[in-house]
Amino acid sequence: MDRSASMRETLKTYFGYDSFRPLQEEIIRHILNKQDALVLMHTGGGKSICYQLPALLCEGTAVVVSPLISLMKDQVEALLANGIAAGALNSSNDETENVQLRRACVEGRLKLLYISPEKLLAEKDYLLRDMNISLFAIDEAHCISQWGHDFRPEYTQMGVLHQQFPQIPIVALTATADKITREDIVRQLHLNHPRIFISSFDRPNISLTVKRGFQAKEKNKAILEFIHRHGGESGIIYCMSRNKTETVAQMLQKQGIRCGVYHAGLSTQHRDETQNDFINDRIQVVCATIAFGMGIDKSNVRWVIHYNLPKSIESFYQEIGRAGRDGLPSDTVLFYSLGDLILLTKFASESNQQNINLEKLQRMQQYAEADICRRRILLSYFGETTTEDCGNCDVCKNPPQRFDGTVIVQKALSAIARTEQQISIGLLIDILRGNYSAEVTGKGYQELKTFGAGRDIPPRDWQDYLLQMLQLGYFEIAYNENNHLKITSSGSNVLFGRTQAALVVIQHEEAVTRKGKKKKVVIAKELPFGAAGGESQDLFEALRGLRKQLADQEALPAYIVLSDKVLHLLCISRPTTIEEFGEISGIGEHKKKKYGKDFVNLIRQFVE
């Protein structure tokens, strides 16, 4: 059998797919030719198969370096469910397990061994010397670079692999890395003339929405409405601080939403319990800092919310990528405020890589403030261009309309000028709104002519307009002067009537009916691939129930048994024999034999 046929047969037998995704076949051939590679492929794009399939076709064991125990566990469970011999050598195992794993590796009974960078360095002169290693795969390779968004010092020592095992190919894989990070990965791993494979970063199934200027109460209200519209679907809420994860989670729990908390300040046991509860659908939502998610291979996360502005587009892209890994429609929402920008600017200014971190934050700010297709901005950041708008972001769905906002801008700039440019955003809004706050009265600002000049505009709208003014360059924030606002020359031109200012009309989500009642926006939930009707939905729910039952029996996450996408395909195809069941994309030989009878028997009840 030639190599192409062997690759396709292995793909179908173990993973249940009839064809490769873009770049997968090319990458696999390159690795089988014992060549080094750097693979950039978006989350859910099929990175794992790029090294798992070569591992099955080569003699020996593939060693996969992974940063998190949870990520290893997820990958190993998925491989075992596909009938592939795999194991993870890490500190969560007892000594007996690790002894058995070492023996299996030396005897060549494992096709893939997952290992942490620390464990790999400890074993490089012992276990690895005694193994027949087919290839090294460095997962989450951006962790090696100080320019990456998730730098981990222990990864920097991975460069010893090529020195100690020069004949063994190395493939480094990541979902996000800009040019400087890619170059750093290649340099630090000492990759030998590697080929760099970059797949499309486009995730057309993920919708992109930005909400600007929301205060905490408004955010919480909007989040509750969003979660209720999504029914019982799984989602993640990312917060900037540990304290905020706790307060948001408590708010959701009081509303009866099954929600957990995850951040670095919690014990390992607590974090593991939260992660396991989320993976196994015992909780619906996780409120987390950026510490959460890399180890999550959960394919049916349907939404991601950023409570605060992320520090970079890489971080943002990686985190929204945790939604919709199965390719089904998923939603993401980013809340953005000037307070976030000020705090993140302070952090970036105090960091070791001040210039580059400020530049990354500025690009994130440009994304959040954009009035052109957001997906085009994301793709452009990673060096990918497209001539078409996506149609699946808030800008495309509701193109911005502009109006003459000169008077609004003049009111704001006049208030800044009358306080001798010694006020922050919050105090400016208090003055414009006519709020007798302690700071306003303490400085006598209630006597200003502009005090209360903007009381007809709600605080949230002022936040949005001020963000627009900042973006248009009418004022700057002096971060080194207590975040005071400074009028620019462009701002002066508007203030003194030399030029006009166009602002974007603020679009509020809630429409109002003639009777004055708020009308909720309803998200239409449809079965993909053309399935429709109540009967299909009934079958889908029955299949989910059976999947959960089988998963509970094996103590596995439900999506490892079969993904939501496979369940939808079963709803459409409705196989009535085990052979037909095995023809469904995503069902390999092992799953066909293991689960075919149970699922076919259930489907027959709906067909007959």
Residue spans for each PLM region:
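Short, charged low-complexity linear segments at domain edges
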Residues: 353-382
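Flexible coil/turn residues that form the inter-helical turn or adjacent wing/linker of helix-turn-helix
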Residues: 166, 231, 371, 421, ...
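Accessory DNA-binding and partner-docking regions appended to nucleic-acid-acting proteins
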Residues: 1-7, 356-358, 387-608
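Short helix-to-turn junction characteristic of helix-turn-helix DNA-binding domains
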Residues: 31, 227, 278, 368, ...
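Helicase motor core with emphasis on the C-terminal RecA-like subdomain
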Residues: 3-14, 18-22, 26-48, 56-58, ...
